[in-house]
Amino acid sequence: MNYMDYDAETLFSVGRRFLNGDCVEKDVVKAKAMLGRAAELGHPLARKLLATIEENSPETADEMAEWNKMRSGEMYDWTDPVIDSSLRRSRLACEKFNRSGIDHDDYRHLLQEMVPGVADSVTILPPFHCDHGNGLHLGEGVFVNYNGMFLDAGDITIGAHTLIGPNCSLYTPQHPMDFRQRRKSLESALPITIGEDCWLGGNVTVCPGVTIGDRCVIGAGSVVTHDIPSDSLAAGNPCRVIRKLN
């Protein structure tokens, strides 16, 4: 059984032991991951202890090493405790958001919890799934239709007034070609950028590292593997420019 599957009280107790080095080897990263999970499950003392750690013991460069690699496009270990804690927090936030529905009184609050700092003019229709939420940078008036899948190990930036059709998938992480590296839980992530006033039709897939310029229209079912210049109508698998729009 994964220790992160324990109940809140057990997570709090074991996490505190990792923090203090009582009976187990001191491990602040693991302690924070366990206390964070306990806090997510509603343990009040875990929240207080975690806040104290954050105030008095800022994460060291070593603790954030894999996270920083992930955000900078380097190879990283996706099982790292800091990354794992973020993934778990995001899964819970997505579950709450998806259960609520857009007409729920707490829709805007739950959206903010899932995508921190998102503008009030942004609309995301549930169900929606993301890896971390804090890697999503959505401009004013962005609309995301049903069943969006945004894997934001790398940053995903979407410009103002862009429309994302149903069942669209934006993938920043990529596994290595070498199976030996895959066995070591290594992967990398490249950012995705979509400009302003774009429209992506339904079932579009955008691959790691792709930039789509402003005012582009991407046809339904396209798989975008390379950059698309601004003012382009593009479609296909792989997606290719059909013509200029202006």
Which residues are covered by each model-predicted region?
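Short coil/turn and helix-start
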Residues: 4, 22-26, 40
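TPR/TPR-like alpha-solenoid signature
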Residues: 5, 12, 32-33, 48
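Hydrophobic face of amphipathic alpha-helices that form TPR/SEL1-like repeat modules
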Residues: 10-20, 52-54
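Flexible, glycine/small-residue-enriched loop-and-beta-strand segment within the central core
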Residues: 128-139, 143-212, 232, 237-246
